[in-house]
Amino acid sequence: MRKSVIAGNWKMHMTCAEAKSYLEEFIPLIKNIKDDRKVVIAPPFTAISTFSNHSDFDYLDISSQNIHWEDQGAFTAEISPKMLLEHGVSYAIVGHSEPRKYFSESDEQINKRAVFAQSSGLTPIVCVGETLEQRERGEADRIITRQVEQGLENTDPSNLIVAYEPIWAIGTGKTCEAEDANKICSLIRKLIGFDDVIIQYGGSVKPNNIDEIMSMSDIDGVLVGGASLDPNSFARIANYK
């Protein structure tokens, strides 16, 4: 049985002091979480040490928000697996729509990040998703297929999470219908060809829709943005029914 992964992406939010305060409130709310799931938070790089130094660290895992495909070198503003592992990081988000959009990340670059993450001992959370225009033109399946085939080439599906995040649903308040999201997640699973690969949904996930999302057969977790910034909201999501 696939284990659910409930992940929060804080993006460029939370100072170290704010992260510490958040954890003090959040940790007690997930201490009795069911053992069929795990909780992951991707804080800003500056706040990662706040997590790794927290006494209740066993209750959740840490993810980075990106990763480079080299361990060191002249790569300004990048961060390497070696640096992250030193702070107890277990996961790395790659291919999120924001770096794809703002920094023109290609599927080839995303693939290099994912492959190097795995070879370094991290589990990549590889994001895929279509724009509203692509969806309205009936191109969603083709776009997702390309992103999966190119972005996941030579990766190990047993140490991989794929997050389906329709770009038009991220931070907009618009949520992809659960059945529609499940169809795309089913497509991703078939493309990968490994039934046990963990597939998440992301895009305006909130306490009021988490139960329906997680009732879908091919959705194994969620990648949460804004709702993960509030400890009570994210705890409700993590403790879905």
UniProtKB/Swiss-Prot annotation:
Positions of substrate binding: N9, W10, K11, G171, S204, G225, G226
Active-site residues (renumbered): H96, E165
GO MF, one annotated term: triose-phosphate isomerase activity
Keyword Cytoplasm: yes
SUPFAM superfamilies in the cross-refs: Triosephosphate isomerase (TIM)
Listed GO biological process terms: gluconeogenesis; glyceraldehyde-3-phosphate biosynthetic process; glycerol catabolic process; glycolytic process
A single GO cellular-component term on record: cytosol
InterPro entries in alphabetical order: Aldolase_TIM, TIM_sf, TrioseP_Isoase_bac/euk, Triosephosphate_isomerase, Triosephosphate_isomerase_AS
Keywords associated with the record: Cytoplasm, Gluconeogenesis, Glycolysis, Isomerase
Protein known as: Triosephosphate isomerase
Species: Prochlorococcus marinus (strain MIT 9215)
Phylogenetic placement of the source organism: Bacteria, Bacillati, Cyanobacteriota, Cyanophyceae, Synechococcales
Gene that specifies this protein: tpiA
